[in-house]
């Protein structure tokens, strides 16, 4: 008869289940974000001309900026996927997002577009038609990425079992 006094869904049990769901959701989110950064980083090496054209003209080392940021995206994206290195990877990605933000501002201010000319050469086009709105929309999206990554800088238990 005593077993009837045990609540099958106690608050503690529900809290453990919810904690597990929340941790699993954050793990899945970090994995998706990490994979996105890894793929974007790889793309820096595949389409170097495109990414070098995005680098503001006042920064003289476009090739270095492209390869360094692409390499950082790969390494930090992988770190975000691995729970043991997630916080460090997230902090690194935050710094990277802040470092590349001036390129987004430059693209908006100067109406920059990256186009392929008739000879098949990728080039940076300043005062391009019809890009202002697109370049403006990129600016707040960077803050969304910062927020998504920032969520993984906080100390979290790595116990995904819910126990």
Segments from the language model and where they lie:
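Membrane-interface extramembranous regions
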Residues: 2-163
């Amino acid at each position: 008869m005593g077993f009837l006094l045990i609540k099958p869904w106690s608050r503690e049990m529900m809290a453990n289940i919810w904690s597990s769901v929340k941790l699993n959701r954050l793990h899945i989110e970090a994995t998706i974000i990490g994979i996105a950064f890894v793929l974007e980083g790889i793309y820096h090496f595949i389409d170097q001309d495109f990414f070098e054209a995005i680098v503001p003209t006042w920064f003289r080392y476009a090739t270095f900026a492209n390869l360094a940021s692409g390499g950082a995206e790969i390494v930090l994206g992988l770190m975000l996927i691995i729970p043991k290195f997630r916080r460090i990877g997230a902090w690194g990605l935050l710094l990277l997002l802040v470092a590349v933000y001036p390129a987004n501002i430059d693209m908006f201010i100067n109406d920059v577009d990256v186009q392929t000319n008739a000879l098949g050469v990728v080039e940076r086009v300043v005062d391009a038609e019809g890009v202002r709105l697109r370049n403006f929309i990129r600016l707040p999206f960077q803050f969304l990425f910062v927020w998504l990554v920032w969520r993984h800088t906080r100390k979290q238990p790595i116990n995904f079992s819910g126990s």
